[in-house]
Every structure is written in structure tokens, then in C-alpha cells.
Amino acid sequence: ETTQQMVEQESEELWYQRVQGSYSLLEQRIASAMRAELSAIVSELETVDSVQRELILRSAGRRVAAKIHQAASTTVRSIVRDAYQEARSKADKFLEDPVAKVVNSADSIIAEIVEHDMQYTSATLYDKLSADAVVDLAHVALVARTLSTTIVARLQTETWATMNQLLKDKRRTIKKYWISQRDDKVRDHHQEADGQVVPVDGKFKLRNNAGGIELCDHPGDARLSPANRINCRCVLRPRRG
């Protein structure tokens, strides 16, 4: 490796460690909210008759989704601010504040992501609570990791897209850059995606287990197959166009 390549790699690794803070905070808040609500549901199940039990089980997914939404919403501004600060040096002056613009639309973005995920998670929650009436911590951790990846990457993409719209100098547009965690746990298809750079409104290409190609906006994109989406640890970084 050349000295320049080593410097760039070190810079990228330091950045990765820093941006992981946004993911970790969101993941912890989502997991904590899920554990608390599921524990409350389990406690209720122990004190009711069969009719009430069924009603509680049927509403479990909606209740957990509401708590996830609430937990994620408290972290929105810090995620958007981090995305803005990372891209700021690569952009130019703006016609208005991009952060406020994204934050104003963030609630509907989170609602969309949570609703999509809970379509699949609700059935699993129902089955697990019906069978065991216990909080499955491994399942909670998996949902929290997947959702945090999706939400952070989506808000990053929205932030950079808004920055591009508000740029005074359109020659300095921001692109997005896919980075895997680059360890022995990274999936082969995600390792192949590592280093891809596309326009903010462009699509990344990932191979899937069937040998086909999947297009996505970011890590954790709902368009991806479960094998490419669940428990993904990849991140995005802005690049100057």
C-alpha cells in the first residue's frame, strides 16, 4: 500500500468508529423500548383469561411498533445532524437549512420503515408470545440492529439528497459510498458491495443467494431480500461528486 492509501484507510476506519455511535445509540434505544413493552405484555398475559389473552397477543405488534417509533424519533435530530456535518466539508453554501427540512419529514420516514418491518415481525412476536410468553432477547437484538441500520442509512440518504437540492454550486454535489465492516463476519455479497460509489439518488448493486442482482438505495433497504438485509452492519459515507 502507498502512504496515501494507508492514510485514507486510517481516516475511513476512524470515521467508521465515529459513525457507529449513531447506529449504536439508536439500536440501544430501540432494543430497550422493545424489551420494556414486551415485558409489560408478558406480565399482562399472566393475569388475564383466554379471551383477553388473545386480544393482547393480537395487539402486541402494534404496541411494540409504537414504542419503536417513539424511541427512534428521539434520535432523529442527532442522526441528521451527524449526516449533515460529515457531508458539509464536501459541499458548499446552501440556500436554506437542510437539517430542519429533513427533520420535518423524518417522522413519516420512520413510520414507513417501522410499519414495513412490523408486518413481518408481528407474526413472529405473536408466535413466540403464544408459545412461551417470554421476551426473546436474541430476536429483540436482531430487530433492533436491522431497524437501526435501515433508519440511519435512510436518514443519511435523505439528508444528502436535500443538501444536493439546496446547493448553490451544483458542481459540488454529494454522492454516497457503501462501506462494509470489513471483518470476517461480513457477508460475501456485502464485501463485494464495499467501495461502491453512486449518486445519492442512484442504486447500489448487491448479489443475492439466488445468483441475481438486487438494487437498493442503502444498507438495510426494504427492497433487499432478508438474507441481504437482516442484521446488516454496513454503513454509508458521503463523497464529493
Where are these regions (language model features)?
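Acidic, glycine-rich two-metal-ion catalytic cores of nucleic acid-processing enzymes
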Residues: A138-G241
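N-terminal leader/targeting and assembly helices and adjacent pre-domain segments
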Residues: E1-R171, L224, R239-G241
